[in-house]
Structure formats: structure tokens, C-alpha cells
From Swiss-Prot:
Belongs to the Dus family. DusB subfamily. The active site is at C100. The lineage of its organism: Bacteria, Pseudomonadati, Pseudomonadota, Gammaproteobacteria, Enterobacterales. This is tRNA-dihydrouridine synthase B. Its cofactor is FMN. It holds the Pfam family Dus.
Amino acid sequence: MHIGQFQLTNRLIAAPMAGISDRPFRALCHAMGAGMTVSEMLSSNPEVWRSDKSRLRMVHSDEPGIRAVQIAGCDPDEMAAARRINADSGAQIIDINMGCPAKKVNRKMAGSALLQYPDLVKQILSTVVKAVDVPVTLKIRTGWAPEHRNCVEIAKLAEDCGIQALTIHGRTRACLFNGFAEYDSIRAVKQAVSIPIIANGDITDPHKARAVLDYTGADALMIGRAAQGRPWIFREIQHYLDTGELLAPLPLVEVKRLLIEHIRELHDFYGPGKGFRIARKHVSWYLQEHAPNDQFRRTFNAIEDASEQLEALKAYFENLA
């Protein structure tokens, strides 16, 4: 699959997830088989561009693979300026967020709130596409509410504005992450436009990935929550798509290696004062299968030193062996 001039190595994309898809996580997903990774959402508000938080979220020219960054906002000119700044920093693809269901984002008329205003969507997309010569993609939901699904209308509008690929999460904003993703709307969009369509939502294992591709006709899949604590899901899915066979479960020794490497990278990236806090949620996800009683996770979350975290993890896995 191509996005503009860029050819993905496969049809699997790591989703932009706020507070999760940082540089260490993106690098790990890339190493585990993602054909592309997308940065966590960056605000287009110029007042926060120079903050440490925004700086850490930006992609840079030395990152592996295709460098894609997601931006959010509602002001067309600010969005265009954010596109230019990120392109200058090394972004090769700009993704526009019109799918985030978070209240704090929607209150600012950003994310999925924009789906209620097709005229503003058109203005934003047209302005951003014209701002810099890098491909622009769009991520949406199926609509604002089940009774107001307008993803086909938005998709046609996006194609007319020059959007190079469209990701659709199979829920409306009102659904948040409740219930199940529905794929009829994604299928309808695929049949209505000619740009690449990326299906997103509840793609949790290789069998589901194959089924969603077959049913929707989507060109690619975007995987988010299922990769939390399980970044090797990309490798598992790709192997199944290629061969029709499932990989054996990842050996515990390999889980240990990946987890400790990931936590080390988080400590280095954020610094010892913040890295240990960021690490806690990732460790919880990794160990959901291996620490079902939560006792170790509760103990781990009380640790406030990076080196002690690493020692605790090593001891934990030694006890499991």
C-alpha cells in the first residue's frame, strides 16, 4: 500500500494513542513488524508547540521507518502551521485527527466533534493539504452518533480535498469504546472512494485481522489497544496473513527481554524523574496474562526509582522461570 510517494512494508499500522504512542513505543512496534507507526496526537495550538510535552511527541528524522505525526485542532490556519513545523522536524506524513472522542478534545471543537461540521472539515483539510508538500491523511469515526453516521460523506469530501488515505474507527463518537466496532460503515466507505482505506477498531488477533480485511475490503489495518503490552501482535498478524498459520506464543524469555528493553527506553527518553511513572502502565499491560492477581503490579507501582523497577522486573521473571 502507498500513501503518497511512500510504500508501506505491509498493511499493518500502529495507531496514534495519546500518552502511549511515544517514540520508544513506536520504535518497538516498528521492530515487531508494524508497516508504519503514527505519533500520538499533537495540538495545533501554537502556544504549546515549544513545550516539553509537544517536543517529546514530535517525530524526528532519525526515527526508523515512515515518519507520520498526527495533529489535532479546529483552526485551519493553525493546523496548516502545525503541519509545516512537523514537516520541518522530519515528519513525512501528516495525519489529521477527527476521531478522538475525549471530552477535553471535543470541547475545543477538535477530534470527532468536527464530524458535525462538514464545511469546517472541508476548510481544514483543504488548507492543510495546500500548506506543505507532504502527504496528508485523515482519521475519523463513523459519525458523531449512531443516528448521525456520515463517514461516507466525510470520506468523499476528504478525497476531493486531496487526502491521501483515510482511517476509520468502527464506532461513533457517542459509542466511545463501548460495545463492538461495526464494519459495515467502513465497507461502505471503501466502496464509495478510491483513496486507500484503513480499518480500525477491535482488531485483536490474526483471525479478526483477516476477517476485517476480507469483509471491508480495506487496504490496511490500524491496531491500537491490542498492541498495548503486546507489540508483537503485528508480527503475529502478518505471519498469519502471509501463511494462514498462527505463530507459537511468544516465549516468556522473549517477553522479559522486550519488556525490560522497553522500560529502559522509557527511562532514557523521559529521564529518571518521569520515566518510571510512564513505565507503570506499560508494565501492567505486559503482565496482564502473567500476573493475574495484581499483587506484583501493585508492588511495582509503588516503586519510585528507575533502577529499582528494572531489578524488580528481573526478579519477577526469575521467579516465574
